[in-house]
Amino acid sequence: MTQFIDCGGSKGKIFITHSVASEHVFSLARRLAKYPVPVLISGETGTGKECVARYIHDNTYAHDAPYVGVNCAAIPENLLEAMLFGYEKGAFTGAVTSFPGKFEQANGGTLLLDEIGDMSLAMQAKLLRVLQEQEVERLGSRQCLPLNIRLIAATNKDLEREVTAGRFRQDLFYRIAVVPIFIPPLRDRRQDILPIARFLLNKYQSCFLRRVNLSDEACQALLNHDWPGNIRELENVVQRGVILAEGDEIKAADLGLPTPHAQAKPGDAMISDVRRHGRNAECDYISEVLRQHQGNKTKTAAFLGITPRALRYRLASMREKGSDMSGR
């Protein structure tokens, strides 16, 4: 049975479960919400780790309890300590005012440390001390603030392997991994693909004021794809299909994915033709998104779920092949 699980938050995120594997994830999350222990959520990029973290928070605390998330990989090492622990005015050059860190902001609620596997060993040692002592001290201060938080850590890495390789502290691993939750990649829970795709289709039909359906060949293409980018990639593909579909039906070529029929036929010519159609669909989609964002490459990259550098590379490649870049 398909379930639509409200993961809360201002963005109204929904996690859709249909497979046994995804139902198990939320069954475990529901049980963990009853106990104030650290939780480690692992899984590939785009599998929905932040959504599960928010679900645990919403089923643990009252609606007004703080929920604070930090992406450890997105903050430079020299700023992460100040961001997490806070600082007093004059603690370092540029500290013109005092700043409460993320631990303080999350006190009485949940702190999500996303991509904790990217944290340096030196920063791991400082984090471990805060977790052991259950108190935090701002940079430039001698006053300790007692903490009462639920820590959730998330990573796309195998932390046990990172421990073995000496890149992650074993004592910190045991501290944060009291109960681990693993979210399987989308390719290992294919029963979830079409329910998620149809939910996203309804979402973007409303956004783009279009009424389209997924053709049988499009559904088969979705099921056959391995989804290295998981749900995030699936969302981009569905958006692309809604935008590029001619008429009231999304075909496999609109998604930029090879059709089952094309995959089954032998011969390099057929494979080359499928790839060319996929590339053309991708170019059309990128051009359309760039146009919607009035040529703003930073916003376009964020919408596509790629880095600005990757977008620049794709745009350069498209120009070399003579693609229409009217969105510039």
Indicate where each model-derived feature is located.
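Short gly/ser/thr-rich secondary-structure transition/capping motifs
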Residues: 90-97, 133-138, 161, 292
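Base-recognition residues in the alpha-helical recognition helix of bacterial helix-turn-helix
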Residues: 125, 129, 137, 308, ...
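AAA+/SF3 P-loop NTPase mechanochemical coupling elements
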Residues: 68, 95-108, 112, 120-126, ...
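Bacterial C-terminal helix-turn-helix
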Residues: 39, 45-49, 54, 271-328
